[in-house]
């Protein structure tokens, strides 16, 4: 059972209650606090599109605490972040691993942040396939193409060479918030909200 807090606001028309995520959305805050999958991606994409339609000139604040997940679902979020006119500021709270770290780096340059005790982890895409040898070969080629594409995007987002990104994503690569800043995945470590 999932518990979602309700917030009650006083207005001149009386009281109004919201679930906490709807209330945060009013302040242009989007949360990813679970695995990236088709359902979470659909919700996040819808929120990004809604906020851009509401005011394309105002920033959107995307808070990330995620172990990662589906590459295709994550790429739907990534593409939407790049497509919309609104700047998307990303903030790591807790952990941004795998696709979570990729989305963290996808924020508007200069507006990518992490809290001081956050942890960021990058690695190569994972895949497990079974079936006929020909089909396994097709899937292996696909995952190698995806790996190359993700590494190129990380290289572009961080300023690191493609060779360094390839080496650094060969295995799980955990970083503190400060290390992620040095690497170029984020721009600043927050200790207090500005």
From Swiss-Prot:
What is the catalytic activity of this protein?
A: Hydrolysis of proteins to small peptides in the presence of ATP and magnesium. alpha-casein is the usual test substrate. In the absence of ATP, only oligopeptides shorter than five residues are hydrolyzed (such as succinyl-Leu-Tyr-|-NHMec, and Leu-Tyr-Leu-|-Tyr-Trp, in which cleavage of the -Tyr-|-Leu- and -Tyr-|-Trp bonds also occurs)
Record flagged with keyword Protease: yes
Q: By its UniProt entry, which InterPro entries does this protein fall under?
A: ClpP, ClpP/crotonase-like_dom_sf, ClpP/TepA, ClpP_His_AS, ClpP_Ser_AS
User: Where would you find this protein in the cell?
Assistant: Cytoplasm
Name the principal localization, coarsely classed.
cytoplasm
Do you know which Gene3D superfamilies this protein is assigned to?
2-enoyl-CoA Hydratase, Chain A, domain 1 (3.90.226.10)
Q: Which GO terms describe its molecular function?
A: ATP-dependent peptidase activity; ATPase binding; serine-type endopeptidase activity
**Which is a GO BP term held by this UniProt record?**
protein quality control for misfolded or incompletely synthesized proteins
Extract one GO cellular component term from the record.
Answer: endopeptidase Clp complex
UniProt EC number: 3.4.21.92
Task: Note the superkingdom of the native organism.
Answer: Bacteria
Key words, A-Z: Cytoplasm, Hydrolase, Protease, Serine protease
Q: Does the keyword Protease apply?
A: yes
> Where are the catalytic residues?
98, 123
Q: A Pfam family for this UniProt protein?
A: CLP_protease
Describe the subunit structure. Answer: Fourteen ClpP subunits assemble into 2 heptameric rings which stack back to back to give a disk-like structure with a central cavity, resembling the structure of eukaryotic proteasomes.
* Database matches in PANTHER family: ATP-DEPENDENT CLP PROTEASE PROTEOLYTIC SUBUNIT (PTHR10381:SF70)
Q: What does this protein do?
A: Cleaves peptides in various proteins in a process that requires ATP hydrolysis. Has a chymotrypsin-like activity. Plays a major role in the degradation of misfolded proteins.
Instruction: Please report which protein family the annotation says this sequence is part of.
Output: Belongs to the peptidase S14 family.
Question: What is the protein's name according to its record?
Answer: ATP-dependent Clp protease proteolytic subunit
Q: What high-level taxonomic lineage is stated for the organism? A: Bacteria, Bacillati, Bacillota, Clostridia, Eubacteriales
- Gene behind this chain? clpP
């Amino acid at each position: 059972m999932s518990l979602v807090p309700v917030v009650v606001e006083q207005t001149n028309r009386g009281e109004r209650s919201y679930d906490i995520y709807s209330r945060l959305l009013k302040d242009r805050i989007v949360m990813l606090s679970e695995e990236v999958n088709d359902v979470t991606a659909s919700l996040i994409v819808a929120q990004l599109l809604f906020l851009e339609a509401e005011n394309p000139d105002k920033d959107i604040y995307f808070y990330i605490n995620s172990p990662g997940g589906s590459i295709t679902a994550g790429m739907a979020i990534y593409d939407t972040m790049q497509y919309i006119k609104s700047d998307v500021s990303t903030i790591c709270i807790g952990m941004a691993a795998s696709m979570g770290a990729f989305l963290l780096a996808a924020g508007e340059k200069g507006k990518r942040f992490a809290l001081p005790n956050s942890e960021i982890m990058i690695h190569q895409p994972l895949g497990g396939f079974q079936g006929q040898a020909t089909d396994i070969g097709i899937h292996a080629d696909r995952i190698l193409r995806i790996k190359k594409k993700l590494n190129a995007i990380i290289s572009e987002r961080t300023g690191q060479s493609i060779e360094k990104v390839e080496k650094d994503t060969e295995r799980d690569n955990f970083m503190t918030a400060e290390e992620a800043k040095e690497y170029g995945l984020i721009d600043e470590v927050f200790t207090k909200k500005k």
